[in-house]
Amino acid sequence: MGQSVVVLGAQWGDEGKGKIVDLLTEEIGAVVRFQGGHNAGHTLVINGKKTVLHLIPSGILRDDALCLIGNGVVISPAALIKEVSELEDAGVEVRSRLKISPAAPLIMPYHIALDQAREKAAGGKAIGTTGRGIGPAYEDKVARRGIRIADLHYPPQLEELLRTALDYHNFVLTKYLGVEAVDFQKTYDEALAFGDYVQPMKSDVAGILHDLRKQGKRVLFEGAQGALLDIDHGTYPYVTSSNTTVGGALAGTGVGADAIDYVLGIAKAYATRVGGGPFPTELDDAVGQGIRDRGAEYGASTGRPRRCGWMDIVALKRAVAINGISGLCITKLDVLDGMEKLKVCIAYEYRGKRTEYAPLDAQGWEECTPVYLEFPGWTENTHGITEWDKLPVAARAYLRALEELAGCPISIVSTGPDRDHTMVLQDPFA
């Protein structure tokens, strides 16, 4: 039987998953996306060349990797076409290697209009979505009024579905949110055209995955966002609209639990968050700004500056527990170079008591004050180091402490943005 590894974020997203997925896709059978949409931004740097992927799996830059998009992903037609075109213009063969589940829901123009109008209306209480229609598309999926890839190939059914959806959403857009209605004919024509475009890529993703496993092929499940943004397990309501945890890999592709052999959790050597929501270790000072500048902490999808803070072990332990993480990958270690001291949150003060467990709601998280353990920093340059013994003593001590505090071994350490700036301590596929 083949081996399957799930790669997912163990914080609030932006942990560097794309680079690690690309690293692990050598001699891979397939890479599959299982949740989210083009709100993800996976940045790859190979031989100094930067590529940002939002929807297509990061394995697309490997010539022999099959790339799959599962039923759990919501697809923007415009975003997919744009990304395919950009990659093909750069000489990457995409359409013969990209397979998309017919059960994947579409992000329609009215979803984008709803997302943006709601965020504007919310003002200071906005969640901080990317405004790309992800949430409203998932709403329609659950409400059973979503339009899926499969529907594009039955024009009469598509017309009926679209009229029903627009009757509902245009009422909300015009009467409640006070913005313009979305035009039926334009939306219908665009949907039909996309149906023709996507037809050659439409495939039974679940069936492909089952066959690959029988053939002994390696499969990598590529998560987007992070565990603490999970719709069920994250800092609700400041979360994304899908299951970013390991269960999403199963439901979002159509494989069983026995198909997963290893779960790799990606975490930065510090912590970041984009948008609203609780962030106990956030640094609103020169230290936080320094981390942001050195780490180039600006969103790959939105360009928004990321909130930066110290490593939060309480949050990380929760991510390890709810995902059954087998090993951790610590990224951006080099960003901490030159810092005199480092802090790690090992517990919270919550309503007068010390706790090592995170509250289950955003309000509870907001009331938490971090309890820190301090570590010496290092002055040496770790950028690009690929051997454990060549790391500064203090850097090794810091990593070993994270490993012990999180109760999970560190499998990979990343010391820079390039694929080669990595040390693999334990190969997840070994």
Swiss-Prot record:
Binding site for GTP: 13-19, 41-43, 306, 332-334, 414-416
GO terms for biological process, alphabetical: 'de novo' AMP biosynthetic process; IMP metabolic process
Record text on cofactor binding: Binds 1 Mg(2+) ion per subunit.
Cofactor: Mg(2+)
Active site: 14 (proton acceptor), 42 (proton donor)
Binding annotation for Mg(2+): 14, 41
Alphabetized InterPro entries for the sequence: Adenylosuccin_syn_GTP-bd, Adenylosuccin_syn_Lys_AS, Adenylosuccinate_synth_dom1, Adenylosuccinate_synth_dom2, Adenylosuccinate_synth_dom3, Adenylosuccinate_synthetase, P-loop_NTPase
Record carries keyword Transit peptide: no
NCBIfam families: PRK01117.1, purA
Job of this protein: Plays an important role in the de novo pathway of purine nucleotide biosynthesis. Catalyzes the first committed step in the biosynthesis of AMP from IMP.
Name this protein carries in UniProt: Adenylosuccinate synthetase
Organism in which the protein naturally occurs: Xanthomonas oryzae pv. oryzae (strain KACC10331 / KXO85)
